[in-house]
Amino acid sequence: MDSSYWENLLLTINRFLGVYPSGRVGVLRWLHTLWSLFLLMYIWTGSIVKCLEFTVEIPTIEKLLYLMEFPGNMATIAILVYYAVLNRPLAHGAELQIERIITGLKGKAKRLVYKRHGQRTLHLMATTLVFHGLCVLVDVVNYDFEFWTTWSSNSVYNLPGLMMSLGVLQYAQPVHFLWLVMDQMRMCLKELKLLQRPPQGSTKLDACYESAFAVLVDAGGGSALMIEEMRYTCNLIEQVHSQFLLRFGLYLVLNLLNSLVSICVELYLIFNFFETPLWEESVLLVYRLLWLAMHGGRIWFILSVNEQILEQKCNLCQLLNELEVCSSRLQRTINRFLLQLQRSIDQPLEACGIVTLDTRSLGGFIGVLMAIVIFLIQIGLGNKSLMGVALNRSNWVYV
């Protein structure tokens, strides 16, 4: 099936959930705007009601961290709806720029990029929908198939969760397109490197044989021209990536913070469960583990997507250094390209100038995470010591 089919299907799901601009004009666009605002107000209302109805007696800091998920969800969904309603020209412009970059590829390379992107789109879309469908199923079982209770729970948990996951894909998919283009550059440089070497088994007349062979390959300056085109394309990729990060920066930062707080709370509650387990709550434990996997997966996915671009830049630098320099023009072109790549590597992109988006930042996230979880555990142990009895287990059952 054509790769664009899966891309269009994913965009249709995003539009239906009100987190991607409508591709229509006139009345249909206004209807989409009203639908997006309705979903936003529905989630906001449900989240506010959930906060007001939360009356479980637990330590204040624990209650604060637990309830922080709701305003976090409300803020991130509001940003996505804002993008969908008012940021349509920017989204359309970014799509055109990516198409412009891909148009510069040769026919076979272009088809390969679209094919690989279509396969990834199908994989991510299926994984996201199946995972959130499983969360809905566990929620239904947890509430003993009570329709309205399950409907209310899914409205404030799984619906915003699905919308935020799709929002992350809105950023990750175009960045993956850029990565695929850079991967094509890597393969072209690898082919050029092989072309510059004489066939295996050839008799070497002298020490300069390989250089002389490379001169024949570069006859007419074709190698220098190809590398110069790659340098220009890399510059465009850098600009487009920066534009996407500027557009999604605030959303990514809020998403990372929201996921970090949620992971802290879920880890603490799972610790409480295994401290004094009640196996009739095992379904809720599964729900906690799924929620933990979702938030942890989001943090890793956001950071790893950007690190792939960084890795490709390093691969390009390595291949450029391995090329046989056979003319002053080729040498100048390679040096300019290397300088551009090195400058880009030394200045990694940051979301809102706060979070460096690569997996090296993961150590900081883990450090903060463990500090908060240990702090919560110490509070719980301190309360038990003061009271002389175990805390009421009602702090486990609040979903």
Curated annotation (Swiss-Prot):
Domain of life according to the entry: Eukaryota
Topological domain ranges for the Cytoplasmic compartment: 1-33, 87-120, 228-250, 304-361
Tissues showing expression: Expressed in the adult labellar chemosensory neurons. In larvae, is expressed in neurons of the terminal external chemosensory organ.
Pfam family, one: 7tm_7
Record function comment: Probable gustatory receptor which mediates acceptance or avoidance behavior, depending on its substrates.
Record family assignment: Belongs to the insect chemoreceptor superfamily. Gustatory receptor (GR) family. Gr10a subfamily.
Protein name in the entry: Putative gustatory receptor 59e
Gene name per UniProt: Gr59e
